[in-house]
Design a protein with these regions (language model features):
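Alpha-helical recognition segments enriched in aromatics with Gly/Pro capping
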Residues: 241, 346-348, 373-385, 501, ...
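Short Cys/His-rich local motifs and their 1-3 flanking residues in nucleic-acid-associated proteins
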Residues: 212-215, 434, 514-518, 557-560
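N-terminal, positively charged nucleic-acid-binding surface of large information/translation enzymes
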Residues: 21-280, 359-372, 376-391, 413-461, ...
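Short, positively charged and aromatic/hydrophobic N-terminal segments
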Residues: 10-11, 17
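Acidic, Ala/Val/Gly-enriched low-complexity intrinsically disordered segments
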Residues: 1-4, 13
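Catalytic alpha/beta core of large soluble enzyme barrels
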Residues: 99, 261-267, 271-382, 459-463, ...
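Short, contiguous pre-domain boundary segments
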Residues: 21-30, 464-478
Length: 590
């Protein structure tokens, strides 16, 4: 049969018959024009509307949520890729007769929009935003916020047309926008619910901080692709031990800008440390594994001890004469060797010296360990990473832009053993790509491990609830559950505030400066009911800065007049609440 088919096909080719079976293809096809013609035909015949409503009466329901696309620029290829998957998924269930909600979402608020508007305006600093209208901060912020709104409206229209060109079938006249009043007030409702459960709190922490945007970057925003391979200067510093002649702690750091904040040196109590004498006669404490790597064959071991034996030793630092350092020099643990907690700050023996520079105000692990051991803290940088007053000649100079000022000082004062280049993965701001620093600041959080208040028996924590919910889901592929549970296990408390920014959710937190009580309002009606001034100026405007901040309420504890905290919300609140506004009307019973 195969041979017969082959002979028949060959005879058709020779006779020219096969050529007549196919239409001639044009060599120069205008695909964009072809797309437009097809789209016009679909609109003329009402094909899209028929597709969207074909299962309107079906009892079968497939619930689909469109995670909102950021409408800040034209779509990229990754958006087209994701939207194609979404479209295929919905088409599959539509063909099977399920009723669906074909609602597109636009993610409108946040730093990503602010940065692009700053570029359009040709400005580079926060203070430039506040002077868009010369000498009028409130009018400047209002102008900036309106420019942000205009940008996202412009690109939401562009992305809508691009999506239609993809053949993406959605109810394009019914998209949801995260900047809408409904979405913002829904987040207020969510945050009030969290507060009622006892999960909202304000506290200090060492957070990743963007010195250009002058705001904190949450764990959720530190994306893998925003870690860069960078080369920085690292330093091995020699810290002289008090009361011991020519005996030093050898300590390595890849962030020299943090050295003025040094409080202690951490060691692992279970590791073996040795005192190595150089040919010069100077002696240095390092881990046993580091001797050959650091000293080669020239170093001679003269003493050996467990790390636990070194704890309590005191040393001198290179910045001890600075006013800010002198202020805390009387603390009993200042400039001392401390035991690490390996669950907080594990110490490596494969690089460095095994003795870890601990700057409580300038590192996440440092802060956590310092909190556990009751260490003092020296704040060294301002929001823009300039060194603060109280740091002598360094004050006013930028810690990240001028690391050489610290390295030069270390060399001149005899505290530098070796300075060398070090290449490592270092995080950058996900929006402006500036290298991050770590800074201790007070922020607002949702607690992951506080038991729920006002419930019968012992309340569950948010972490427990989320893990239980994750295990109820049918994950495709299956390994998704394992990844999700691992993420939930290690997730820190959720940083929900952004200091010093403008375009975003106005956090509904009113903090009394007199009695420290804070309250979380749950929506527009509650705000109107509680307002003691400013409602007339705010009414009719969107719940954004600076308009929302006209409204003041009375503290329920001491009756003081209270303003809203100046922070905006973390942008992940906006998309995270997307499940609710399209389906839930805020009524008392809800």
């Amino acid at each position: 049969a195969a041979l017969a088919t082959q002979k028949l096909f060959t005879s058709w080719v020779k006779s020219g018959k096969i050529r007549s079976m196919f239409k001639k293809v044009m060599q120069n096809v205008n695909f964009p024009e072809m797309e437009k013609k097809i789209l016009a035909d679909w609109e003329k015949t009402g094909l899209v509307e028929k597709y969207l409503s074909r299962n309107k009466a079906s009892e079968k329901r497939f619930s689909f949520l469109d995670g909102p696309i950021t409408d800040n620029n034209p779509m990229g290829v990754h958006h087209a890729w994701g939207r194609t998957y979404k479209d295929l998924w919905q088409r599959y269930f539509n063909m099977k007769g399920y009723r669906e909600r074909f609602q597109n979402g636009f993610d409108c608020q946040g730093l990503w929009v602010e940065v692009e508007v700053e570029k359009e305006l040709g400005i580079h600093q926060k203070k430039d935003i506040e002077n868009l209208v010369p000498n009028d901060r409130k009018a400047s912020i209002a102008k900036f916020v309106e420019l942000c709104k205009a940008r996202v409206m412009k690109y939401s229209q562009i992305q809508t047309e691009q999506s239609k060109r993809l053949g993406y079938f959605m109810d394009w006249d019914n998209s949801y926008y995260t900047m809408s009043d409904e979405n913002n007030f829904m987040i207020w409702h969510f945050l009030k619910t969290c507060h009622r459960k006892g999960w909202i709190y304000k506290g200090p922490d060492s957070v990743p901080w963007c010195p250009r945007c002058e705001t904190a970057i949450s764990q959720h925003e530190m994306l893998t692709e925003d870690y860069k391979e960078l080369t920085h200067k690292s330093i091995y510093m020699r810290l002289p031990l008090a009361g011991r002649k020519r005996e030093y702690l050898l300590v390595w750091t890849t962030t020299p800008w943090t050295i003025p904040a040094n409080i202690a040196v951490a060691v692992d109590g279970n590791l073996d440390y040795v005192l190595v004498r150089e040919e010069s006669g100077d002696k240095y404490w390092v881990t046993e594994e580091a001797v050959e790597r650091l000293f080669g064959k020239t170093g001679k071991t003269v003493k050996k001890a467990k790390g636990a034996k070194l704890t309590g030793l005191k040393y001198r630092g290179a910045f001890d004469n600075l006013p800010s350092v002198k202020k805390i020099a009387g603390h009993p643990k200042f400039h001392s060797v401390i035991p690490t907690d390996v669950q907080i700050m594990p110490i490596s023996t494969s690089e460095g010296t095994g003795l870890v520079h601990t700057a409580v105000s300038a590192g996440q692990e440092d802060f956590t360990l310092g909190k556990k051991l009751d260490l003092p803290m020296i704040a060294v940088i301002a929001d823009n990473a300039d060194y603060l007053p109280g740091l002598g000649k360094f004050s006013g100079q930028n810690a990240k832009k001028h690391p050489e000022i610290i390295l030069d000082h270390m060399q001149n004062e005899g505290f530098a053993w070796k300075i060398e280049n070090y290449t490592h993965r270092y995080p950058a701001c996900w929006r402006c790509k500036t290298e991050l620093v770590w800074k201790v600041t007070e922020e607002w959080y949702i607690a992951m491990d506080r038991p729920e208040k006002h419930v019968t028996g012992k309340g569950k924590t948010l972490r427990q609830m989320m893990k239980e919910t994750a295990q109820m889901i049918d994950w495709r592929p299956k390994f998704g559950l394992e990844r999700e549970l691992d993420w939930l296990l290690h997730m820190h408390d959720w940083l929900i505030s952004k200091k010093n920014r403008y375009w975003g959710l106005a956090l509904p937190i009113f903090e009394c400066q007199k009695c420290a009580n804070f309250e979380v309002l749950g929506g527009k009606e509650e705000l109107k009911k509680r307002a003691v001034s400013g409602w007339e100026k705010f009414e009719g405007k969107s719940p954004h800065k600076p308009y929302i901040d006209e409204v003041k309420i009375k503290c329920s504890k001491c009756t003081e007049t209270v303003s809203r905290v100046s922070d905006v919300g973390n942008v992940w609140l906006d998309a995270g609440i997307g499940l609710f506004p399209p389906m839930l009307i805020l009524k008392p019973q809800n």
